A protein has these predicted regions:
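Secretory pathway targeting signatures of secreted, lumenal, and periplasmic proteins
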Residues: 2-54
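Sec/Tat-exported extracytoplasmic proteins
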Residues: 13, 36-38, 49-56, 106, ...
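Extracytoplasmic/secreted envelope proteins and their assembly/folding machinery
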Residues: 19, 42-49, 99-100, 125-132
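Active-site beta-strand termini and strand-to-loop segments that position acidic
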Residues: 22-26, 80, 103-105
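Second-shell loop/turn segments in exported
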Residues: 31-38, 88, 114-122
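Structural recognition of the beta-strand scaffold that forms the well-ordered cores
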Residues: 33, 76-79, 110-113
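Signature of long, low-cysteine stretches enriched in small and polar/charged residues
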Residues: 46-103
Length: 139
């Protein structure tokens, strides 16, 4: 895979659940999006993990996840890899990974999520973390 392609994000239209929406990677299957979610940070971490059939974590394990700055707040860096089941009974995508940040910002749950082929997600993680630090919530 050409590493240079993981750094080119194609802007896609926003959708009902995606405030910002991008595609990345040589395969064309990598996605990055920003959304506001229901529930707690822990609820959303476990939802992401479940999409990869990874075990749920508890509050103590949540505290041990790496911290990342996003929208002037501190979020939790979440990663998993394997067979991605995605939302709403989407077809299983083997060999995929997720990386992202989930934070409580101003009483809302802000998520920045990257999903795609594992090698492409791994290569783009530093770009995603840098992007997280640039996000701001509108007043």
């Amino acid at each position: 895979m050409g590493r240079e392609n993981c750094f080119i994000w194609v802007v896609l239209p926003a959708s009902q659940f995606r405030l910002l929406n991008y595609r990345f990677g040589e395969s064309g299957m990598g996605e990055v999006w920003v959304s506001l979610a229901q529930g707690s940070v822990l609820d959303n971490v476990n939802r992401w993990l479940k999409q990869f059939e990874a075990p749920a974590i508890d509050a103590a394990a949540l505290e041990k996840l790496p911290a990342v700055t996003i929208a002037g707040s501190t979020g939790k860096w979440v990663t998993a890899a394997g067979d991605y089941t995605g939302p709403m009974n989407a077809p299983v995508k083997p060999g995929f990974a997720v990386a992202g940040v989930i934070a409580s910002v101003g009483g809302q749950i802000l998520t920045l999520k990257m999903v795609g082929p594992k090698a492409e997600v791994e290569a783009a993680k530093p770009v995603l973390e840098s992007f997280a630090k640039t996000l701001r919530m509108a007043e």
